[in-house]
Amino acid sequence: MRLAGKVAFISGGARGMGATEAKLFANEGAAVAIGDVLEEAGKRTEAEINQSGGQALFVPLDVTSEQSWLDAIGATVAKFGRLDILVNNAGVSAHGMIEFTTEADWDRVMDVNSKGPFLGTKAAIPEMRKSGGGSIINISSQLGLVGTEMSSPQYQSSKGAIRLLTKTTALQYAPDGIR
């Protein structure tokens, strides 16, 4: 078990790719905190992991709220004693051309996909430092690298922002053993 003794927090972990990530991490021995706005699905994923012999905790999380992140990371550390891994998985998509994109549409995608990982990373770093280091995994997309008419400008911009957030954070916190 490659992750035995480690504690992972996965945003958007209630269903889909995030739930799969949570189960994989648990299968490798990590205790897993599942943060999501989808409480019923999150509790179901938590139960599946716990019933299969893993350790999981569901915590409510609105990735666009700094206080929600602080509460979720705090609950994780209170339950498991540390934080070693953060997976910023929560995300939303959008389609359409820029001239038909409302400011609210733009803000929603940017808040979840870019601000969310920023706030999660900010909340996780102090706890990772206490643990002697950690790993931050930000889920992006190939659409963060290339433009296409098949997606939306706000989605592609948000995924490009995640890539540079990841690179900058890794460089700034490498001396702390956080990558």
Segments and roles (model prediction):
Residues 3-33:
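Canonical Rossmann dinucleotide-binding motif of NAD(H)/NADP(H)-dependent dehydrogenases/reductases
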Residues 39-40, 61-71, 103:
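The beta1-alpha1 cofactor-binding region of Rossmann-like NAD(H)/NADP(H)-dependent oxidoreductases
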Residues 97-98, 105-107:
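Substrate-binding pocket helix/loop in short-chain dehydrogenase/reductase
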Residues 101, 147-156, 168, 178:
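Active-site loop-to-helix junction immediately N-terminal to the catalytic Tyr of the SDR YXXXK motif
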Residues 121, 158, 166:
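Active-site helix of classical SDR
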Residues 126, 171-175:
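Alpha-helical segment proximal to the catalytic Tyr-Lys
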Residues 141:
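Residue(s) in the substrate-gating loop at a strand-loop-helix junction
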